[in-house]
């Protein structure tokens, strides 16, 4: 009989939303404790860990005796507490658009997020009655899955939210020879634990990284209500301008579907990008768009008038000020889950993604708002697929 103890510190590399059902500040508030501080419930962690395992390992994590009776899990997962004293919560707007970028009635909402860069600490305890070495391998797999972003937490995980990196793992094993140490040890001074890297994780995904340079301005707007400031500004996270994964997804899904309809193969757009909002049968997306941070940019202000589209006259009271992001550089990361796809489907999807990337490079598609006045254009500087540089012209010809 022994007890395995792990102390984990991890950082969210992208914004995070785990809700509590409240709508006090936004339509979807994040969960907070009685002191108003965000945390990740242990139930959320345990559920994500369990879901990431295969059937055999799920039985180790949560053993079932029969359909009517369950056995207590040997795993204890604590809440993940944030180490920062305070968090500057942010608000994101969510909206559904049709293929012509027209808003769909009843689908405007906002939600609260925790910005990237927060540190979380939690612990895993395993009560091992039989000294089963598989428990240690199971913890290795879970931690490696977090670090490889195979496990993502919370809301909109396939659209860039909820990714983490492991910063530190400390571990200690207690048994009959040192069980008294369990009552007075310091969890911050555990033995450093070498995170086991699962090579098999890499084979589950196709990873694409696209280096991009803005060709002018970009307008993915969020509203301001502070007096004296711009009415609209480009969306930020942690004081950095970003391109949300939802924006990339919308752009790629529309153009991807255009090419998909030209092919005879029976690949449904829902099998790749997930079911749309009107579908009764929800299908999880197999493609992930990471939120992009913009670097080396300029923020330019403009004062503009709203124009009546019928007679081109100015609209009374329609004067507004906006701030847009210009001439920056960024990187788009796309991850395709290959587990439910055959080799032919993977190759087709890769080719179509490269076609969409080429369309972006050529200016045939644009990102964000105000695209009719030249916003949202990019030049592709480099494309990497599974850490190998590819020539865009050769791949799509």
Locations of regions flagged by a protein language model:
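Small/polar/charged residue-enriched interaction surfaces, especially the RNA/DNA-contacting tracks
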Residues: 1-397
């Amino acid at each position: 009989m022994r007890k395995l103890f792990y102390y984990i510190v991890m950082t969210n590399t992208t914004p995070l939303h785990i809700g509590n059902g409240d709508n006090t500040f936004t339509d979807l508030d994040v969960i907070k404790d009685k002191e108003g501080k965000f945390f990740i419930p242990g139930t959320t962690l345990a559920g994500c860990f369990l879901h990431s395992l295969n059937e055999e390992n799920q039985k180790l994590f949560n053993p079932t005796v029969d359909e009517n009776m369950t056995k207590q899990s040997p795993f204890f997962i604590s809440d993940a507490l944030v180490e920062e004293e305070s968090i500057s919560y942010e608000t994101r707007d969510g909206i559904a658009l049709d293929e012509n970028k027209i808003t769909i009635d009843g689908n405007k909402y906002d939600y609260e997020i925790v910005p990237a860069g927060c540190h979380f600490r939690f612990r895993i305890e395993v009560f091992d009655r039989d000294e089963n070495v598989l428990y240690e391998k199971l913890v290795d797999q879970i931690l490696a899955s977090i670090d490889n972003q195979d496990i993502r937490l919370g809301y909109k995980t396939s659209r860039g939210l909820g990714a983490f990196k492991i910063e530190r793992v400390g571990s200690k094993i207690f048994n009959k020879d040192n069980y008294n140490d369990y009552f007075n040890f310091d969890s911050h001074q555990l033995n450093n634990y070498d995170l086991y890297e699962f090579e098999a994780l890499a084979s589950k995904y196709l990873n694409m990284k696209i280096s991009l340079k803005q060709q002018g301005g970009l307008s993915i707007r969020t509203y301001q209500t502070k007096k004296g400031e711009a009415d609209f500004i480009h969306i930020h996270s942690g004081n950095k301008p970003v391109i949300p994964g939802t924006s990339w997804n919308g752009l790629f899904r529309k153009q991807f579907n255009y090419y998909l309809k030209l092919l005879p193969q029976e690949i449904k757009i829902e099998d790749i990008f997930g079911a749309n909002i009107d579908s009764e049968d929800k299908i999880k997306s197999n493609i992930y768009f990471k939120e992009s941070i913009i670097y080396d940019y300029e923020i330019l202000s403009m004062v503009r008038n709203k124009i009546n589209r019928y007679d081109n006259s100015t609209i009374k009271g329609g004067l507004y000020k906006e701030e847009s992001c210009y001439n920056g550089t960024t990187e788009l990361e796309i991850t395709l889950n290959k587990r439910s796809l055959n080799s032919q489907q993977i190759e087709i999807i890769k080719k179509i993604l490269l076609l969409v990337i080429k369309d972006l490079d050529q200016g045939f598609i644009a990102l964000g708002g105000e695209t009719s006045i030249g916003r949202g254009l990019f030049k592709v500087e480099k494309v990497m697929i599974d850490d190998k540089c590819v020539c865009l012209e050769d791949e799509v010809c």
